[in-house]
């Protein structure tokens, strides 16, 4: 059983899908591991460390030769997979909705493409969930990015020269990224408030010492929502939420938006008029900018200023913490493959629940129901 870890080729992608730690663990399972030379360089993992952990290093073609499983962070370009074995697995973040044509090309190659972001939100799959591990770091980094752009301090400071007021931070969307953003902003000494469409998040917000800001008179999503995700809301709810947000946002110094809907463009949470209502020098960080953005006027890959307010739209935020993001992503992949490792067969054998959820292609066809529906 040969496992290949590729060097990422997407612009700005610094993460890597295997680390010396996970290579060592795969070797202990009985697998052969091949790592493309330089794969971990941008994340501070040297080729020598991979070799010491038991991996062989080589060119992409050498690494792919006879590989049974190909690991990636982002889905590799099908044209960059020379000589890929029929039936080989490709396990990575494949962006199936955004890169639907690429999924079809994986099928044409005869590959079995496994989209790690389709991992079901169930207890036994938590350690395999790349969305959670990467979103957690993104939420942390969003607060640091906001602090770097904000021309004032976060905590209240009482000095001989007078008092510095604490920054007011508002987090919109309380998933994994939002919860970490709340916790990080609180650690930095900010006054934090947060909102979400899911009723169950109210007590999570309170547990972190932040103030919940919720629409009270129109029903949102009870509980956690489908699989822990938000869905599209009614027009009535959207109008009530916009009114509530408008009155609250004008008093905030920092706003961090994290709202995503799987398979759909990101919901618009902040209008240009709401941006204009904020104080000059305020900062908004839009973590959903690559999916269309929560903030009107946000530009992917740029920090823009509108009405005196900075709108931060960094791409691929987890990659900006490449070492930790890689370590967690690589562990997610190892936890996934090792959980299904059949010692007698010497390879992983997926069960139906998780296999059917993440498998996009098999036998030359696209087979995932979410893509066929």
Residues of each region from the PLM?
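Glycine-rich phosphate/diphosphate-binding loop of Rossmann-like nucleotide-binding domains
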Residues: 6-45, 155-248
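ADP-ribose/adenylate-binding Rossmann-like module
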Residues: 84-117, 254-312
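Short glycine-/small-residue-rich Rossmann-like dinucleotide-binding loops
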Residues: 68, 74-75, 94-95, 216, ...
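Generic hydrophobic/aromatic pocket-lining and core-packing "Φ" positions
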Residues: 23, 47, 81, 103, ...
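A structured beta-alpha segment of the ubiquitous adenosine-cofactor-binding alpha/beta core
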Residues: 54-65, 75-76, 223-255, 259-276, ...
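Adenosine-phosphate binding glycine-rich loop
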Residues: 117-118, 123-160, 166, 289, ...
